[in-house]
Amino acid sequence: MDAKFNVKTFQGMILALQDYWAQQGCTIVQPFDMEVGAGTSHPMTALRAIGPEPMAFAYVQPSRRPTDGRYGENPNRLQHYYQFQVVIKPSPDNIQELYLGSLKMLGFDPTQHDIRFVEDNWENPTLGAWGLGWEVWLNGMEVTQFTYFQQVGGLECKPVTGEVTYGLERLAMYIQGVDSVYDLVWSDGPLGKTTYGDVFHQNEVEQSTYNFEYADVDFLFECFNKYEQEAKFLLKQEPRMENDKEIWVETALPLPAYERILKAAHSFNLLDARKAISVTERQRYILRIRALTKGVAEAYYASREALGFPGCKK
């Protein structure tokens, strides 16, 4: 167990994971500052997995899934939660051993605990991404998803990116031996203990109320359409009208376009929580997002190719 950090707190566990993966060569970057449903949507994964340039990043990512809210009444279902993401390209041959080393650092000796890799291939329809993968079960509870990316944005991943996604709340609940996420000790310092509930319970109550009851459906439909239009404009797929004139971007801007797609996707997720989209419509919206993501992937690849894939020269 890492003696530098108190892994029996949520805060200390995150610091220990950051320190461990930094020692393995990962650059520790900060969370993406927009609403995403998973750590995979961070540009350091979703875009950097495209093309031949090597990378190694690790980061915490706050993630939002509006339909998973339970008004703060469920001990392990949240509409806002945390993932710890590790992405390395090309995926090292010993990435599973590195992962097991991180568990050992957190106090889980593989010879003393039941750690299983259960095949579970991964797919993200809106990202146009899929990969070969495994769930990692620790003493009967899923705590991590392991994925070898095969495609992102419809583009084949060459070389393959290895991704490790820790479910931080689940892992912490096991380490701390609590049955409710709200009882987790977030920090324990000179001013006393702060629990997960102290930090986030009210947020879960209020955000669940908004997601399910008060999110403005007409406004969200309008947001989706506007973000889609803006993304198409930034990808040079269609012009914008200004003062009765067509305006075109000179060069596609895949990074700002991707941010508009994430905004559209979050609007869609809120509409889903409000049950404003039928099953048939749901598939159509997913395909609209996927088409935009494909455009971003192609534009991002082209932009890096035009630069001569500078990451390959280091």
Swiss-Prot record:
Top-level EC class as recorded in UniProt: ligase
Annotated catalysed reactions: tRNA(Gly) + glycine + ATP = glycyl-tRNA(Gly) + AMP + diphosphate
Keyword Glycoprotein: no
Localization terms from the record: Cytoplasm
GO biological process terms held by the UniProt record: glycyl-tRNA aminoacylation
EC number(s) stated in the UniProt entry for this protein: 6.1.1.14
Keywords: Aminoacyl-tRNA synthetase, ATP-binding, Cytoplasm, Ligase, Nucleotide-binding, Protein biosynthesis
One GO cellular component, as annotated: cytosol
GO terms, molecular function: ATP binding; glycine-tRNA ligase activity
Assembly description: Tetramer of two alpha and two beta subunits.
Family to which this protein belongs: Belongs to the class-II aminoacyl-tRNA synthetase family.
Protein name: Glycine--tRNA ligase alpha subunit
Species, as recorded: Actinobacillus succinogenes (strain ATCC 55618 / DSM 22257 / CCUG 43843 / 130Z)
Annotated gene: glyQ
